[in-house]
């Protein structure tokens, strides 16, 4: 088969769809007073990271329970949660903007029913 045709087109496995129970109404956070020094670029957080943070830190679920709700493994929740916590800490410590954006593979819970 010619190159670029057939089986070998994709790289790795397809990303599993993540079930999102809450789409944030406020998606852009910024400091009340912009820094006087050179501003740093904004931080981008995906819906997946936001959902993991919401379920574990806000609702108090375990990572296993959050993974079941999102339709992913506990390890995936751990990765998203670690990334989200780091981004929130960067936003607070460095006074940077935080923008929450869809990652492309999230589905609102109940949309497939």
Swiss-Prot record:
Gene3D superfamilies (UniProt xref): Winged helix-like DNA-binding domain superfamily/Winged helix DNA-binding domain (1.10.10.10)
Coiled-coil parts of chain: none
Entry-linked InterPro entries: RNA_pol_sigma_r3/r4-like, UPF0251, WH-like_DNA-bd_sf
HAMAP family: UPF0251
Family to which the UniProt record says this protein belongs: Belongs to the UPF0251 family.
Annotated protein name in UniProt: UPF0251 protein TK0562
Organism of this sequence: Thermococcus kodakarensis (strain ATCC BAA-918 / JCM 12380 / KOD1) (Pyrococcus kodakaraensis (strain KOD1))
Phylogenetic classification of the source organism: Archaea, Methanobacteriati, Methanobacteriota, Thermococci, Thermococcales
């Amino acid at each position: 088969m010619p190159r670029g045709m057939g089986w070998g087109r994709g790289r790795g496995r397809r990303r599993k769809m993540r079930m999102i129970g809450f789409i944030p109404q406020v998606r852009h956070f910024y400091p009340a007073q912009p820094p006087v020094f050179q501003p740093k670029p904004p931080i981008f957080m995906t819906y997946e990271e936001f959902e993991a943070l919401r379920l574990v830190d806000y609702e108090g679920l375990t990572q296993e329970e959050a993974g079941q709700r999102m339709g992913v493994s506990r390890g995936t929740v751990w990765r998203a949660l670690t990334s989200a916590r780091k981004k929130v800490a960067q936003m607070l410590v460095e006074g940077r903007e935080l923008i929450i954006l869809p990652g492309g593979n999230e589905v609102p819970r109940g949309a497939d029913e």
